[in-house]
Structure formats: C-alpha cells, structure tokens
Amino acid sequence: MEGEDGGMNRSIDRQAELRRMEEACRQTRHQLDMIEHQIIRRMTALIPSLGRRKYGYRRGRPPEPEAFLTRYRSNLAAITAQRQPEIDALARKLMRQQSAIAALQETIP
C-alpha cells in the first residue's frame, strides 16, 4: 500500500509541476506577444509620418509607391532590432520550457 500511495503522490506532484510549467510557458508566450503588439503599435503610430514627404506632384513628379514601403520596412527593421535581444532571449526560454514540459509529460502516466 505504501508503494502505491508514494507513486500516486509523485504523480500528483508531477501533474502540479506540469501545470506550473505550462503556466510559466503561457506567460513567456504572452511576453513575446506583448512585444509584437508594442512593435505594431509603434509602426501604426509612424505610418502617417512615413507617408508625408515634400516630394510628389507639387514638384512635378508623381509620388513613388515603393518609397513608402521602403521607409516602412526600414523603420520596422530598426524598431525590431531594438527589441531583438529581448525577443531572442524569450524565444530561447520558450523553447527550453516547451522541451521541459514535453519531457515531464513523458514521465506522467
């Protein structure tokens, strides 16, 4: 009987640990999502200023459609680069958490 109770307690402990690990993993994913949303918000705020240029029909030339996209991509790359170390660290943490969760799930009957 003692052996069964010990095994059952360990199984319950592992399940509780698994729930804690899954919650930590969800929080890490949430942090990554928050960074993505912050980048999107910054880019959305920049769009009006990216479209405004003194060049265009007023100077006798039509506006270049690719110019806006070039400015947009350049700003997106710069904003993302500022957050890249944090994004990379969270991505590595998420991979470690997912691996640990998978390993623990294999030990739970």
Positions of PLM-derived features:
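Short, charge/polar-rich alpha-helical segments
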Residues: G7-M43, I79-A91
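Extended alpha-helical coiled-coil "stalk/arm" regions
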Residues: L32-E66
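Long amphipathic alpha-helical coiled-coil segments
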Residues: R42-I47, R73-P109
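Amphipathic protein-protein interaction modules
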Residues: K54-E86
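Short, Lys/Arg-enriched N-terminal segments with co-localized hydrophobic residues
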Residues: M1-G7
